[in-house]
């Protein structure tokens, strides 16, 4: 996924601190964060505003192993919450805003919900 930003270094630093990627690097002008098999590329663009105009239109979902720890790191970073961490029948969900105002959801599914999803396929 490619995110455009007027301040890509700030955005990269936030994602790296909040979500602890497996890898953080730069390729040409792109800041690249790897989360498992998913790559988040962050690029500088002059044709976007400093804040997401319609942030609820797209939500980045991150499946995390410890949603409480991720939420705590986000709190330490001064993150604004759209929906704070909540337990939904054993699965944990929270939606935050990154520094550009994009919505970022952290999800930790319970073993029961994971098993139910496996049965659907």
Question: Locations of the language-model features?
Answer:
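Vicinal oxygen chelate
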Residues: 20-65, 71-97, 108-121
């Amino acid at each position: 996924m490619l995110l455009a930003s007027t301040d890509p270094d700030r955005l990269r630093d936030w994602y790296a601190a909040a979500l602890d990627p497996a890898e953080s690097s730069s390729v040409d002008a792109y800041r690249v964060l790897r989360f498992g098999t998913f790559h988040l590329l962050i690029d500088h663009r002059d044709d976007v505003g400093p804040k997401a105009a319609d942030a609820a239109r797209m939500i980045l979902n991150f499946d995390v192993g410890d949603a409480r720890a991720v939420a705590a790191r986000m709190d330490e970073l001064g993150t604004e919450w759209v929906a704070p961490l909540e337990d939904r029948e054993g699965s944990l969900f929270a939606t935050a805003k990154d520094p550009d105002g994009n919505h970022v959801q952290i999800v930790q599914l319970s073993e029961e919900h994971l098993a139910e999803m496996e049965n659907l396929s």
